[in-house]
Amino acid sequence: VQLTAGLVYERVNEMKKAESAFESAMRLGKGNPNIQNAYAGFLCRTGKNIAGEKLFAEVIRNPLYQTPEVAFVNAGVCARSAGNVLDADRYFNRAIAIRPNMPEALLQLGNDAFDRGEAADARDIVQRYLAVNAPTADILWLGFRAQRKLGDSVAAAVYARRIQTEFPNSEQAQNMRNGVDR
């Protein structure tokens, strides 16, 4: 109940109440890795990245936590939000070592590669993703941007068309209609 309250309070931007609810959940569910994972995410989203990463590390080490790859991705997002892109990529790669085609880890790595100016690596990650996972607007957007950066207007147009037809109401489709390609 307290965990849910924390998530709801965060959603409605009642951060003090959210933090109090998360802390109650942590006390009541001492050692529960699912509660720890949620609270670690909250810590990261509220700028307490060091504490969040430390708690994610506890979650990852907990043998009762059945999806450590999720905690690795969450820790990577946390590290990146603190400006630690190299650490973030290490976490994403650890997630992929556990679950090789994990969509969120691949997307994160692809975005990081693109942001580093490695458009060919980003393109390759998009292709790997799409070979085994259902498309999302985010991955198609990354594919579009990577192909444009590489100068392949034909491949970029394929991604653009897919975004417009498969995800017409997405932020990415709206960006394309407005001429935004970042």
Write out the residue ranges for each language-model feature.
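Start-of-helix register in tetratricopeptide repeats
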Residues: 34, 67-70, 104, 138, ...
